[in-house]
Every structure is written in C-alpha cells, then in structure tokens.
UniProtKB/Swiss-Prot annotation:
Annotated GO MF terms: ATP binding; ATP hydrolysis activity; ATP-dependent DNA damage sensor activity; damaged DNA binding; single-stranded DNA binding
Record-given protein name: Protein RecA
Described purpose of this protein according to its UniProt entry: Can catalyze the hydrolysis of ATP in the presence of single-stranded DNA, the ATP-dependent uptake of single-stranded DNA by duplex DNA, and the ATP-dependent hybridization of homologous single-stranded DNAs. It interacts with LexA causing its activation and leading to its autocatalytic cleavage.
Keyword Nucleotide-binding: yes
SMART domains linked: AAA (SM00382)
Cellular component, GO annotation: cytosol
A Pfam family of this chain: RecA_C
Family membership noted in the UniProt record: Belongs to the RecA family.
PROSITE patterns to which the protein is assigned, alphabetical: RECA_1, RECA_2, RECA_3
Keywords: ATP-binding, Cytoplasm, DNA damage, DNA recombination, DNA repair, DNA-binding, Nucleotide-binding, SOS response
Binding site for ATP: 67-74
CDD domains (UniProt xref): RecA (cd00983)
Amino acid sequence: MKIDANKEKALNAVLGQIEKQFGKGSIMKLGENRSMDVETISTGSLSLDVALGAGGLPMGRIVEIYGPESSGKTTLTLELIAAAQREGKVCAFIDAEHALDPIYAKKLGVDIDNLLCSQPDTGEQALEICDALTRSGAVDVIVVDSVAALTPKAEIEGEIGDSHMGLAARMMSQAMRKLAGNLKQTNTMLIFINQIRMKIGVMFGNPETTTGGNALKFYASVRLDIRRTGAIKERDEVVGNETRVKVVKNKIAAPFKQAEFQILYGQGINRTGELVDLGVAHKLVEKAGAWYSYKGDKIGQGRANAGKFLLDNPAIAEEIDTALRGMLLASVEPAVESEVGDENVDLETGEIF
C-alpha cells in the first residue's frame, strides 16, 4: 500500500515518539516482529487439543473451565500442569477451595515438589498473588480453583446474612483489567475453574450461569464447558466417567467444537483409549472384528487390551499421537467470534437472548 510521503514522515515521527515514551514494541504493525502462531500446552486429551484447534490451551491468555460438581474440572487442570511441567515450565496452583489432593495430583503425573501452591484467606489476596506471580515473569501457568471460592474480604469480615451485592463481580472485574495486559507481556497462562449456578425465574433459554460476574466471560480467550455424560463400569464397579467438553468460546480458532474422552478414577484422562478410537477413525489403527492392529501387527483383542498394549509400549503410542496431531491439527486461522458464550446465542439465528 502506497502512503503519501508527508504522512509516512509524520507516522514515523509519532511512532518514534511513542516508542521513546513507552518503550520499544509498545506499537507496531500487526504482521511485523510478532509470532503469528500461538504457543499452546496440551490439555492431556488429544481429542480436546484437536477441538481447540491449536493443539492445546494458549499461553499469555485467560482460560475459564466450568461445569457441575465432580465433572473433571480440577483433573483437567492437573493434567495440563503435568504436561507443562514435562516441558520445563513453572506452574502455580491457587487453591481457594482448600481441597487440592497432593496424592491424586502425583498420580496424574504432577511434580508436586516443584508445584507452587497457595491457599489464600480472601479473594483479593488470591488475585494479588496471581498478579505478583504474573509480573515476576518466572511462572508460566497459574490455576485458580475456583472463582466461586474467591470470597471478598468484606464478606469474610461481615456476618452471615449480610448483603454483599455485586462485591465478587466488582473484584473480578478489577482483577481482569489489571491481569490481562501483564499476562500477555509475560506469556503466562491463567486458568480459572468456575462453578455453575441457576438463574431464578428463567422460563426460556438456559438457566445456568457462572459465578463472579460477566468480566471473566469477556476477558477469557477460551471457555470450556465440561460435563460428565455417563459412568464407565468394569463388571458392577464404576471405574471412571465418560466426559464431554464443549469449546464455548475460542479466540484462537473456531469455537463450538466438542471433545469426548474418559476420565478414570485415580489415573486421569484415558489417553491410550483415545489413541485407539481416533486411530481407528482415521485409518491409522486397523480393526478386524474384536482385534486391533497397527502396521500389520496385532496390538490387542478388544479396546481395553489395545489400550494396555499402548500403555506398555509408549514409543508406539507416541508415534500414533504424533501422526494423529499431524493429520488433525492444520494451521490455525484466528476466529471471529462472539464475546458471549453459546448459552446466550441462538446458533441458527445468531440472536442474543
């Protein structure tokens, strides 16, 4: 694009002045000296990484994971922390619910000796700790569990029954404004786990909403809705949950995609089962009757045995994983998406209700 010489001279002068006042990189052309690819960390589930479009959750952004109780929210974040630690990243867990189980975290592959953990007394304290860790530039992933447990100081110091209308929402709104810029500058991922509440008197549409006001919905680059859809049984014993995750909002790829996987009690996400299912679906793993085979070699009779074979042979599992990621994760184009979740939008008409 040809720019008038006088305009170009004036533009260069003002750009130089801005950089002198606010520092180099404070303003630049969108395609200049920027990493166009978003750095991501795997969620621990291949199907969810594919649904997110970029191969995982994005660094330098705010992420919200919400769902009913015992749906797998904390498990998903612990799987992500384990994946981040394997890449040499520093992680922190702000345990506002005071319910983190270190034994379970260790079973999922989390290095608990190097996981920073805080159990704050108030919501303000939790968010100040988040801000301090972010500004240090030394922490890569911060998880806050949960937004509903971030109780404002005024509410803690007051009496039960006192009205504190909008306090938590105001606190979250202020924190989002402060944190968003710092997270981008230091390339830190901040994950908020959230709970579901019911709106009173809703006759039409979805009565469900999340706690902490609307600020988090707007500032989050990715919002995940996680639900338990069924039980996994071995004979009469329940050994895990069938889980569905819906990408409600996505600023790094197309939103509204879904992923289904299994969470096994005491083990976390059933990765090998996913590899078998996706391998068969994309013709990497052959299935003949009950037998599964890979590159002509039989790997097991039945899905469970095929999964066990991959668990015992991590090199083959890694080979299938790499091949599937290469097939399913194309280059990501940033999506133009709504600032509200799909619970407020009619997908057919696009009307907000």
